[in-house]
């Protein structure tokens, strides 16, 4: 079997102490507390460098791709990000939940939608249509080895009024959406649509209506005074 290649690798240490106090001490040292669970193995408390996480997280696919986890003295593990807690106002991670991957067993994961061909779409390039993205990710089920980095949504032939739904997505072989595609309502969920551009007179009407509304509010305020 060929050696698995990973786009992301993390290095961690085992957390001997747990609890809020221990977590605060780790964060002061530039470490982020985390937990690994699943795979018929006991949960394991670990800590990862904040800088290493921030570097990897610059690419959004980090949150949906299989990660190779290295812990000193242990065999490498394959994991997926399951939950992330952020600092309330600082650009820092507070905690990560990871799920162990078991080769051969299907997993559920969030995959990015990548919209391509927009610059060639006649409804956009020629007619000035507006692209409205209703979804940017989808939940999929597949074997770990088949997990795609993203799912492409081709807009190159899109015209004004066109709608792309979940049923229109071209999924890689062995990958399926979480949900019942036999359910017409689910299958018809809108992913992206190309709308008519707003005309100048419509914009003027909108601006006039907003100005009239603001004037009414000022008049009411004057009466109250």
Curated annotation (Swiss-Prot):
Alphabetical GO biological process terms: translation
GO molecular function, one term: structural constituent of ribosome
Record-level GO cellular component terms: cytosolic large ribosomal subunit
CDD domains assigned to the protein according to its UniProt record, in alphabetical order: Ribosomal_L25_TL5_CTC
Organism domain of life: Bacteria
Any single Pfam family the record assigns to this protein: Ribosomal_L25p
InterPro entries, alphabetized: Rbsml_bL25/Gln-tRNA_synth_N, Ribosomal_bL25/Gln-tRNA_synth, Ribosomal_bL25_b-dom, Ribosomal_bL25_C, Ribosomal_bL25_long, Ribosomal_bL25_short, Ribosomal_L25_dom, Ribosomal_uL5_bac-type
Entry keyword set: Ribonucleoprotein, Ribosomal protein, RNA-binding, rRNA-binding
Sequence segments annotated as region (Disordered): 197-225
Biased composition range(s): Acidic residues: 202-225
Subunit structure of this chain's protein: Part of the 50S ribosomal subunit; part of the 5S rRNA/L5/L18/L25 subcomplex. Contacts the 5S rRNA. Binds to the 5S rRNA independently of L5 and L18.
Family according to the record: Belongs to the bacterial ribosomal protein bL25 family. CTC subfamily.
Biological role stated in the UniProt entry: This is one of the proteins that binds to the 5S RNA in the ribosome where it forms part of the central protuberance.
UniProt name for this protein: Large ribosomal subunit protein bL25
Natural source organism: Dichelobacter nodosus (strain VCS1703A)
């Amino acid at each position: 079997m060929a050696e698995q290649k990973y786009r992301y690798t993390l290095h961690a240490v085992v957390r001997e102490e747990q609890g809020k106090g221990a977590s605060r001490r780790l964060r002061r040292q530039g470490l982020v507390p985390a937990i690994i669970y699943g795979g018929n193995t006991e949960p394991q408390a670990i800590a990862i460098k904040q800088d290493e996480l921030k570097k990897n997280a610059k690419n959004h696919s980090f949150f949906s791709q299989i990660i190779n986890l290295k812990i000193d003295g242990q065999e490498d593990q394959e994991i997926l990000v399951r939950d992330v807690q952020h600092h309330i106002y600082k650009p820092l991670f507070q905690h990560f939940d990871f799920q162990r991957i078991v080769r051969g067993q299907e997993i559920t994961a969030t995959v990015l939608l990548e919209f391509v061909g927009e610059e060639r779409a006649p409804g956009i390039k020629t007619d000035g249509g507006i692209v409205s993205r209703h979804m940017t990710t989808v939940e999929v089920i597949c074997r770990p080895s088949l997990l795609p980095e993203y799912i492409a949504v081709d807009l190159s032939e899109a015209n004004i009024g066109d709608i792309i739904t979940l049923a229109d997505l071209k999924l890689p072989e062995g990958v399926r959406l979480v949900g019942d595609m036999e359910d017409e309502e689910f299958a018809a969920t809108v992913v992206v649509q190309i709308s008519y551009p707003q005309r100048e007179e419509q914009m003027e009407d909108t601006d006039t209506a907003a100005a009239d509304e603001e004037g009414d509010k000022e008049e009411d305020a004057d009466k109250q005074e």
